Amino acid sequence: MYNPPPGGGGGNNGGDQSQQQPTNNATLFLLQMIQQSQHQQQHQNQQQQQLELQIRDQERILIEQQRMQHQQQQNQLLQGLNQFPFNPLGLFQVQAAVQAAQAQFAQNAQGSPIPFHIGSPLQPSHSPAASALQQQYLLPSHSPAITPFARNSEAARNIEQFIAQEEAANVPRANSQQQSPLIRPIPQQQALNIQNLTSTQQAQQILAHHRQVPVQQVQHQQHIPTPPLALPIAQQGPISNEVPSVPPVVPATSAGCPQREPRQQQGGRRQNRPGRRKKPEGPPRVDEALAYLRVIKSTFSSDVPVYHRFLEIMKDFRAQRIETPDVIEQVAELLYDSPELVLGFNTFLPTGYRITLTPDRKYVFSSPQMQPRVLLSPDERRARAIEAGAQAVGAIELGSQEGISKDEDRTIEDEDMDKSKEKDDVDGIDDEDDEESGIEDKNNEEMMEEDNHLIEEIICDDRKKDDCEDSQQEIEMSSELAAHTLNIIELLKKSFLARPTKLVDFMTFIDFFMSDQQYKKDMEKLRKDDEDDEIEENEKIEVDDVPGPSNAPQEIKKPDDIEKKDSSKNLQIEESCSDYLVSMLANCCIGEPDLLAATIDFLPYLGKLLVNGSDAIALKIKTILHFSATNDRNDIPPVNRVNPSDVDMDLVKQMEKCKMGTKKNEKLKLKVAGQGDEGATVELMILKKSYRILYERLKSRTTPNQLSHLMVLINAYANLDITREQLISELPKIMGTSGSDLEMIILQLLGAEKEPKNRPENDMDAVMRKDLPAIQPKRGLRDQKMLQQVKNVEAATVCTLGPSYRFMKDTKATDCSGRVELDDDLKGVLNDTWTSIPSWSSEDTGSQAIKKSNLEEFHFKTEDERYELDIIVDSNRTVIEQLSKTLRDYEAMSDEDKKSFKLDKWLNASSRSTTIRVLAKVFTNSAQDFIDAAQKNPLVGLRRILESLKEKDLLWSRFQQDTNRTWRDALDKQMSAATTILNNQHKNYDQKAFKSKPLVNQIEQICEERRKNNSTDTSPHLILEYTPERKVYRDVNDVTGHFFHDLSGTKCDRDRTKIVLFSYRILMEWLCQEGQQVQIDLDNGEIFKFQGDLNEDENLMTLLNMDGRRICGDRVVPVSTSLESNESSIDHFSENLHQKRTRRTFYGDDSVYMIIRYHHMIQERFAKILSTQAIYAQEHFDNQKKNKRWEDGIGADMHGRKALQENIKQRRAAVNDIRNVRSCPSSSYETTLRELKQLGNAQMDIVAFEEAVKNLFPGDIVLFNNIDKLFSSLAKNIHHATCAEERENPIKLYLKYRQRIMNAERDEDMESVIQEYGQTAEEVLRGKNTYRFEFVEEQNKPFIKIWVIPREEKDDDDDDDEEGNEGGKDEDNVKDEDDGGDGEGRDGPDDDQPPPSNDDGDDEEDEDDEEDGPSGADEPESTSGSGNVPMDHLNIGENFLWSPPEEKVCTGKMTTNEKEQRNSVDYMKVTTTPRLRIHKRMLKEHKGCNVELMTGFQQLSAIVPLM
């Protein structure tokens, strides 16, 4: 690759080609100016508003006082002139200078667009002119002279007389229309008089007199630079005797750019107000520059390229591509027809540079380095260029003739003389005589050299002719380009409206194109020069036929193979550039065929490239213009289709990705009329999406006026003139309404929608995010500069290689210093083209880091501070160790070794930087003195340094201990605050997680999703993992038993016994754990022991159906290893029970599901606490070992040396304080369980419990949040499942199949029993959610699988069978009545309380009782067989209800005869009418019954399980 030269073109085409440049660079420059002035402008506006009100009233009075003071100074100046002997001319100069200062203000203010503040001119006190009295007569108008007071009025009369004479002689005054020069030319005689005045004696007399007479001087508070014209006489050269003539103003041959005059010349400055400090003079403010830009922009609103060209000039000057005179010439040429703008540009020029306007409307440019000259207008410049071209053509014709006569030579010499004469006129020097004398002194011996000179001139003329032809071609090309400029600008606006970033790509293409053309021109010139050089060499070889020694250096000619290699390399570069140029053009004009075609017409060389280029280039452009998606187009004939193999598919795919449309598969067809006579249309391009659709959508929804305003607003946003918020706020004003469709479209493009679904990246119809203008967040000045830097780099990037390497345009490769000649293979791997630039991906301003919490911020800050302190202490100790070793070695040396021993600059330490840093920390600025002393006397110096270091070590160690305590206390406070916040968050989360509805909905939702998707997946809906620790299961049961006392709806201890029995036996069996033995004591002395015997199922069923009043108490016996009951049946049953422990299957309803979920939550927390205790215990043991080693003295030797005992004690105490060694936490888990049991027994409140647990497990306090509510929820659901007296009881159903499952010897038998068990559960639990639970203990990782079977409504036939059952109840209900009827009548009305439900103990039956109470009294008797209780059975019921206490009760074992006798009892036959309604009817029919009978009915209603 090559580095293209800077600049877009060459020759005289720069001005015309500037009109075609896009406004991207100009916009970036203006953006940079606005960004730099933003903060300064705001600050100045605030100060100006505050001071404006205070100064406004005083300003008028101060101005009048200043004028009066100025007039007094002028009068005093004129009065003091009579003290000095000088001629009337000097007096006139002083008078003219004073009057010119007054007229200068208004004249400068009128010619400038920037508001100028007129003030009084001031003379700097430090100016050399103030100390040289002779210089006062030559001061410019803006520096008033200071002279002593006049003694009398004689000088005033002389001045008045002289003024009258001069007016009579029509001497021009300073207040005339034409401004008088600041320093007039002094005649020769008068100049000599002034020079004589500078003699030493006169100067001493004047200075002595000046010291005697008080002089009124003006005090200044600012620095005003002295103009370079007014130098002191002492520094000026001697005045020549010749009278200098005013040099004529010669027009400049090139357009110039002026510089500004100092502020004093533009109208002076204000005098200092009393009590107000004046700001120093500085460069033009940013607001002035912005105001000047606004005036230019508004003036040339119809001719926008002028404004853009002005910004490009300013950018070139800022990049130091052009100098100050070039800027002035170009600006004057650009703004030639606007004098107020040209003169206003003086505001921004340096001191000494100025543009003035002559009466004939010509601009004169003056600068300190050159004489004033007239700036040409654009027409004059073009005329001169044409004239210069014509002269060059004439010279070529003359040089091509065979003979050159002497007259023609004389003509050429005359022309040279005229040119030199004009040049002398420009410089103000008349050298005609010198030139004539130089020509006459030529010798005849130089005729041969003259002939050679003429030959070289002819060759140069030939080159000029070629350059002239090139310039004419460029002029013609520029005229053609000007015809298409407006068209290409309109196409650019339309094409890049919705994607302004593409404008940068187009700009890059234009620059690359112009650079490529310039490179080709340069290469063509080089070829021509080489050919001319070859011709000259051949001619010289022919002339030099005479043999002889030659001292001329001979050029070494390159071999032919090297020339061929260079030519092939250049040809390869041109071809690659052409290919890359076409690719850039295609990438810029993606989706814009009209713009692509207009660009080809707009750039003539591009058309030549397509015509003269390779077939691949031409085919590439043609396929871009005429390619159509032929895969899904049947309406295009095969003849007109393009072969896909000839198409650049990568480019087409890229074009497809970057488009947008209103629909995903929409196609945009662009057609143009064919060239044939038939008039058929030719499809240029067929795309699925296009940016034109966005413009069409806006155009269809707006009026032309609204669309115009909208385009202006969008362009302002794209140029970063307004923010996104301002754009959004202006949309309703343009549309007239709020919430219109157009407003919604623009909001989607800007990404202003709050809903994620409405964002553009989620909308298939919206513009792709990468083509949208970036959302500009509020950035500071630093971020804005970074953004501008990124944009500049992106604009200058031609292509990239990886994320960081870029090929930049206008970048010259820097020559590597020290590189030697290498082989071609080695040179190929060197990088001379690519520039490494950061990608800024990791510094993206749109992304923000996660905000740290207060605890994290404190941790970071504390760790940094502790690290710094530790580095200081450790570095000091390291230096002490090294210097101590050096001192010990020195003391052990002999006298001879001591004399030869020397210390280096770092005291022989291993780490130089550490030693210097520590010594500088301890001794500050005296460190080097101590080092020098130690080098002179090592023994004394090292001892003194070690004493200081050890003293600092003790001081810093104490400080470290104090800071460690402070940091630890602060960390504890921060940790406590953070823990409190975290606990509150977890409490809110746990309160929602403990509710039954979310837990049930969780598994129901999974089942519903599978059902909707018709999934055949049979995997579990939910899997819960358990801990393998056996102890945790028993601990959960122990703690749960203490949370039953406060349950609503419980019946004292009778329900608690059933709950304990379920928890210790059934639940543990479900979880494949060994159940604990439970012993139940009845009121008659019977004892039920549950330890895994054959009758355990029957006993469990009996106790669950038994009235709790008969239970005296229960005891949980630990698992016994004694052999008290070793019957064969018990052993056989126990073996089966333990063999099947690895897998359990059972069914349940919502209550069982909630029991499993709550039990799993508690078990998981207990397992976490137990593992944390193990970690704490291990840490405690490790700390004890370390502390023991420390006490034994292993850690006392720091850095391999023995420290003092006092230091050891302090370090040991500091380490103990930091480690904060606690007692052994092995009992923390047991202590927590005791605290939980006290909490369950209401012996402790939740606040005291949290404080106690916080000391035991400070990092796991969140595990105990809402622990009381979690246990209460578990106890409530266990109570509801075990004490429910309904037929659909899943626990009773499990006990029915439990023994059959345990006795199954084969897996097939067990599966059949489980299948039957599941079918029965689905029938019994119909109308509720049925869950299947399967607990598996596998490889010491137990888990439970849960399936849910959605609820089904009961059929009407099933309800009729239950209500019309004439035979009464089934066998299970009869057993329930038998077991529940024993011993009734003790607690009376307490039996009416139903078991608690899962909905916080709400009793629905009580509500039915209240609703049915009034209607039940008036309900007629039912004579059908659905509601009567036969009276002949009352005695049976009475005898049954009131059996004597000595009646035999059920023992642990029942014989077959007892079961048959029990089943033969004739129970009362009642219908399935609701229980409370039967009770009320019986009371109504038998009002005369005694109390015992009524009580019997009440207890009967409580025992018989009716629906």
UniProtKB/Swiss-Prot annotation:
Keywords: Nucleus, Repressor. One of its GO terms (cellular component) is Sin3-type complex. Residues 16-26 have a biased composition (Polar residues). SUPFAM superfamilies: PAH2 domain. Its main location: nucleus. GO terms for biological process: cell fate specification; defense response to other organism; locomotion; negative regulation of transcription by RNA polymerase II; nematode male tail mating organ morphogenesis; response to endoplasmic reticulum stress; vulval development. Disruption phenotype: Uncoordinated movement, protruding vulva and ray fusion defects in the male tail. RNAi-mediated knockdown results in sterility. RNAi-mediated knockdown in a him-8 mutant background results in no deposition of dimethylated 'Lys-9' of histone H3 (H3K9me2) on asynapsed chromosome pairs. Gene3D superfamilies: Paired amphipathic helix. Component of the SIN3S complex, which contains at least sin-3, hda-1, athp-1 and mrg-1. Interacts with ztf-11; the interaction is weak. Interacts with cfp-1. Residues 1-26, 228-286, 397-450, 543-569, 1349-1434 are annotated as: Disordered. Pfam families: PAH, Sin3_corepress, Sin3a_C. Residues 270-279 have a biased composition (Basic residues). Residues 282-352 form the PAH domain. Residues 427-438, 1354-1365, 1373-1382, 1389-1421 have a biased composition (Acidic residues). GO terms for molecular function: transcription corepressor activity. This is Paired amphipathic helix protein sin-3.
